[in-house]
Amino acid sequence: MIINKLLSHLNNLSLSQLPDFINKMIDPDTFKRKEFIYKCSQESPEGSYILDAGAGQCPYKGFFNKQKYIATDLSVGDINWDYSKLDVLSNLETLPFKNNVFHSIICINVLEHVKEPFNVISEFYRVLKPGGSLYVTVPQGWWLHQEPYDYFRYTNYGISYLLEKAHFFINDIKPTSGYFSYLANRITFLPKALFWTIKSKIIRILLLPFEIISYLLFVLLIPIILNCIDGYDKQNKFTLHYMVKASK
């Protein structure tokens, strides 16, 4: 019984279950994106309308308690998600809003999941107020996810091209990581690749000590070391994501 519970816990292990200070050392990429969203909340006036485009489970709603937060999504990305917090169910290519409504739009790791990203970005431009800001994050180095709704990966040149084509002015574009943090992120999946596909419970139990060691090494120790030296990569061509602020 204890072994079964331990195996179940390992199969469902998530970095979010770890304390924040450890999680930040293992996964600084996620924390940088949260800081990016916090920046949007600080730069958006109290009472202004904020659109979370592709909001999913609305994990960023709490950042905008002083603004009028509106969440929209097509709710097809993940069958296990809870979409009940959405305000509007819509296709991002045809947003059901009037022109020039929102002061800010956040679109966090969404544009890889739409078939026509230019059409979506053009819609953002339409519903954004003149002088308003768009805060976008897109993946460059990320695994296949939310299948079959996973279509694109973006370089800084690719996302810049789409935004400028839609008449946005790019204020800032930054990578979230360099080569070492990219490598750290990849390594955390090694225990899953090695052990989670084993169907025989007996073999899994026999290998359990090695699995636990693999978590300590490849999910904790090595990623922390790699993230600590990520600053040595000055080019950041292996980044996990780009964060872009653009204005109308």
Task: Please tell me what each predicted stretch does.
Residues 11-19, 75, 83, 137, ...:
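A generic structural signal for ordered alpha-helices
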Residues 1-44:
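Class I SAM-dependent methyltransferase Rossmann-like catalytic core
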